[in-house]
From Swiss-Prot:
Catalytic, as annotated region: 438-449
One GO MF term: cellulase activity
Modifications the protein undergoes after translation, according to the UniProt entry: The linker region (also termed 'hinge') may be a potential site for proteolysis.
Source organism of this protein record: Cellulomonas fimi
Protein name (Swiss-Prot/TrEMBL): Endoglucanase A
UniProt cross-references to Gene3D superfamilies, sorted A to Z: 1, 4-beta cellobiohydrolase (3.20.20.40), 2.60.40.290
Gene that this sequence comes from: cenA
Signal peptide: 1-31
Amino acid sequence: MSTRRTAAALLAAAAVAVGGLTALTTTAAQAAPGCRVDYAVTNQWPGGFGANVTITNLGDPVSSWKLDWTYTAGQRIQQLWNGTASTNGGQVSVTSLPWNGSIPTGGTASFGFNGSWAGSNPTPASFSLNGTTCTGTVPTTSPTPTPTPTTPTPTPTPTPTPTPTVTPQPTSGFYVDPTTQGYRAWQAASGTDKALLEKIALTPQAYWVGNWADASHAQAEVADYTGRAVAAGKTPMLVVYAIPGRDCGSHSGGGVSESEYARWVDTVAQGIKGNPIVILEPDALAQLGDCSGQGDRVGFLKYAAKSLTLKGARVYIDAGHAKWLSVDTPVNRLNQVGFEYAVGFALNTSNYQTTADSKAYGQQISQRLGGKKFVIDTSRNGNGSNGEWCNPRGRALGERPVAVNDGSGLDALLWVKLPGESDGACNGGPAAGQWWQEIALEMARNARW
């Protein structure tokens, strides 16, 4: 009943600005061609790589875009976000989505992807945008001769210099990740939509790591994310989500094999920098015994908690939500895992139960566990639950992340799920983890802050 975040390669290695590559559409509505394209290989591992592409508009505003390039060494795009990709052999075309097609003068649009390679992974030699070959400059034309004026030529009004974009600083002790889908959507938006999406983009949220990439790539993601948080003097939040038999084959089904899990966790743990909060395996205990293929799930959780804690993590074992299991069940299962290498448990991950209900439920569990601490995911619980768990409509953003020290056992309110990322292909939503702007705006609009 939980969903993963879209996997994305985030390391700032091998970044390549492709010769100031520029182009823009030549249609009458989108004239004055000129832009910059930055193609950055952000991470690379045997057989795979991640990349980010940023388009900066140096000409007139455009309402949609299509970027074309050709791979010459057999590279292939496997998963792309913030755009739609089509390929024909080595030829690649990426088109804008309904919500990020508009680029004002001086504005940017970006997308990212994971790809495959073999032998070599050279940067594409050229790009074209909306049919115009990238040249690196705004094309010039011969000016039409100006007749001699009979009146003094007025002094033209100076064009103001665009104000550089500044990454806002987070307002709490938790880290705001500027690489999330919500953050990129906010950057691309304008008007009322931008004001609403700011509520999501500038609120600290967890980074999900799972087996949608191999273990070494997942380790690199963790190292990059936690490293950026530590450099900013903030606390990172991670979700580890790769347990065998994950989600019992539902919308977020998957996980690594039983024989691979310990090695996968150890590899990922090697990437930890600082002391991140880690939510360990959403739904794993709540679904214990519900399907085959789980192996020694309690043993896996014990091992993962130890491996992560020894590398500096503060581990909270996920225990479901307030309307799922009676108090006795999570108490029994959490006791089986134990707390030698965990500071507490987590509730309401990716769910919609109110903070009040979740806190009352957590306190009952905590009392039975000798006062163990707990955290609550409040990312989407502002209107509580309507009984649905997969993309219910009419929900709202919940309380913003904050550390708690009120003597109740509650350690923190966190945004574990990333609002705007789909729960799965249900109720009109895209696949799990994909950005869904419509529901992001709805939850932001319904928020009580």
